[in-house]
Regions:
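Active-site His/Glu-centered metal-binding helix of metallohydrolases
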Residues: 122, 126, 130
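Hydrophobic alpha-helical transmembrane segments
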Residues: 1-118, 131-280
Length: 280
């Protein structure tokens, strides 16, 4: 509990101190420092890079390399995963991290600037490090996990709704760029349907928000049983397998991530603009 509180607190103090010094020296310098900080907080580029490595391994290097690549981005055991399991793991990670890697940082940067983004990332990192539900970390990491649930509660729901909208944009774009106007890999209708029905099918109150929207958008089934630290963990299926998962869905989930991130950036900029105009 102490670690989960002290880490975000120290992170916030250090970040604010750097910004105060920067803005005190020069307003432009302060803006540059805060802009660099905000860029570093967002995980879009690193997420895309990792998922491309998984896709490339599946396409060019074989299943074992794909397992190794996906092991770098998931907490589950990957040694026994087949191709479907590797793709599912990658897509699920994109879906979940759309919320805690992109939407939530933007949300807290909108409210509190770069300091808010860094404090949020510290909370999220503590959950990733010690928030596991196993015998070793169950009690030690419980507070970190609960704190992460609290700070992600609103952003996760914003992310889920925006991903549904993103499904519609992706569906329209795909139809405009293909000869087949009747079939699409995306479906805004199914995204909304699965988001409403499956967004609570997870032990975490937040994890299935964007995952359900992504599963519905791609018309595939996600989640289900996985092995963690050698033990089988049963999880409910999220989504309906209207079509089977394929390697291309890794890229499609990334497209949903980028559109969702873009929509959130627009919302953040509009809100901050309204606030600036209101306080003048």
């Amino acid at each position: 509990m102490v670690l989960a509180i002290l880490t975000p607190l120290i992170t916030g103090i250090v970040t604010v101190s750097i910004l105060v010094v920067g803005y005190h020296i020069n307003m432009i310098l302060g803006c540059v420092i805060e802009t660099i900080m905000c860029y570093q907080i967002l995980a879009v580029k690193s997420l895309q890079s990792r998922k491309y490595e998984v896709y490339y391994a599946l396409d060019k290097e074989g299943l074992q390399q794909a397992r190794n690549a996906v092991a770098m981005i998931v907490g589950r055991d990957t040694k026994q995963l087949d191709e479907h399991g590797v793709v599912r793991a990658a897509v699920e990670t994109v879906a979940e991290n759309t919320s805690d890697g992109v939407i939530a940082p933007l949300f807290y940067m909108m409210l509190f600037g770069a300091a808010g983004g860094f404090v949020y990332k510290a909370v999220n990192t503590m959950d990733s490090m010690i928030g596991y539900k196993n015998d070793k970390y169950l009690y030690f990491g419980r507070f970190a996990a609960k704190l992460d649930d609290v700070v992600n509660f609103i952003p996760a729901r914003i992310g889920g709704c925006l991903m549904v909208v993103s499904a519609g944009i992706a569906q329209l774009a795909e139809k405009c760029n293909t000869k087949d106007k009747t079939n699409s890999h995306y479906s805004i209708g199914n995204a909304w349907k699965i988001f409403k029905s499956d967004r609570k099918k997870h032990s975490s109150p937040n994890a299935a928000q964007t995952e359900s929207a992504c599963a519905g958008a791609l018309k595939v089934a996600l989640s289900g049983d996985n092995y963690y630290f050698g033990k089988l963990v049963h999880k409910p299926q999220i989504g309906e397998a209207i079509r089977p998962l394929e390697a291309g869905d890794i890229g499609r989930s990334n497209i949903l991530l980028y559109i969702t991130a873009f929509l959130m950036v627009i919302i953040v900029l509009l809100i901050r603009l309204i606030i600036m105009l209101a306080v003048r």
